[in-house]
Amino acid sequence: MRVLISGITSFLGISTGKALLKKGHEVYGILRPESRNKERLKGEKGMQLLSLNMESFLLWEKENEIEAEYTNSTTEAGINTERCITTERGITTENNSTTDSHAIDKSISLPSLARLHFDAVLHFAWDGVGSLGRSDIATQEKNLRMSKAFFSWAKAHGVKRFFFAGSQAEMGKGSREEPLPASPYGEKKLAFSEYGLRNHGKMEFIDLRIYSIYGKGDHERSLVKTLVRNTLRGMETELGSGNKIWNFMAEEDFGQALAFLTDLEIQTRGAFTIDICSGESRLLSDYIKEIEQIGFSFLKKKGLRYSGESLLRFGLRPPNVEGDYDFTAHTKELSALGFEERVSFSSGIEELYEFIYETEF
């Protein structure tokens, strides 16, 4: 199967791409022409990276709307979609072909992209995912418009299955069934989710509600990595209350889950929402305490000194923009389809301690 991934250099994009390659799929990833993150994929054999600005799909959508109303409109506007569109608009022609078996990076035009005839698209690209960005209305509105244009492009070019990387933010104060998003980020992600479920036509639309994924590739200031580093250093960690239901899933299991869903035969449902999570949800504070205890055991095993007294300081940090709400995951959906997790929370955290200790200490 030929698969296109937007946001390929993200933590989740990389995890998914690796899992799909292992299953024998052809994997193409979209990244910004100026991306500084493509080094994350260095050495990934078989992955093909395509330099393309996601805003290009907005231009494609605009051109197609014009063509529907006026004859020869692209000629009148001075736009030639078969040749190079200026790099200011975010597209360059194909070049830099290579026979390197590692990740291939080349620029591509939209017509050339269409000729690759993708079977599935996994859409991770979404700006403003940090706390400040989630509150930025303009950024989140732009994300929504670009996502709709990308969706329309995929639908128009025969893509069979479109995956959207949603999150808990769409639920906010509510639930998956009755969402009440608490931020512009959650509102716009929910808006695209609903748009895809309504307008997918013959293209299958899988609305992924992704819970907290942890692992080696997670961003450096994530809660889990911060806890691991602080435990190794014997430093205190200031935290929120931790009194909310949470769910953690290992990055290896996440990638495998997406590869599983990509291969899944869908008999009766052309579009549906599914939670991507582990089989267990519990209080966030319980997870946090377990991470610290695993760290103490790790330090003892290494023969390193530690006090044994908890360095967790709950109740000192305010909630983020999403608020301090329970996120109750549908923990049985993936297993009901036949997916099996391989990494327990304890073993995943032990591996992360080993990785961070070996690479940073």
What do these predicted regions represent?
Residues V3-K23:
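N-terminal Rossmann NAD(P)H-binding glycine-rich loop of SDR-like oxidoreductase domains
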Residues S131-A138, K173-E177, H219:
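Conserved catalytic-core motifs of eukaryotic protein kinase domains, centered on the activation segment
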Residues A138-M146, S183, E187-K188, M249:
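Glycine-rich NAD(P)-binding loop of the Rossmann-fold in SDR/ketoreductase-type enzymes
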Residues P184, E194-W246, E251-G255, A259-F260, ...:
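NAD(P)-dependent short-chain dehydrogenase/reductase
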Residues V121-H123, D127, K148-P184, I206:
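Conserved Rossmann-fold NAD(P)-dependent oxidoreductase catalytic core, especially the SDR/UDP-sugar
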Residues M235, L239-N243, N247-F361:
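C-terminal substrate-binding subdomain of Rossmann-fold SDR/epimerase-dehydratase oxidoreductases
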Residues I30-S35:
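N-terminal Rossmann-fold cofactor-binding loop
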Residues M54-S73, D100-K142:
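NAD(P)H-binding glycine-rich loop region in Rossmannoid oxidoreductase-like domains
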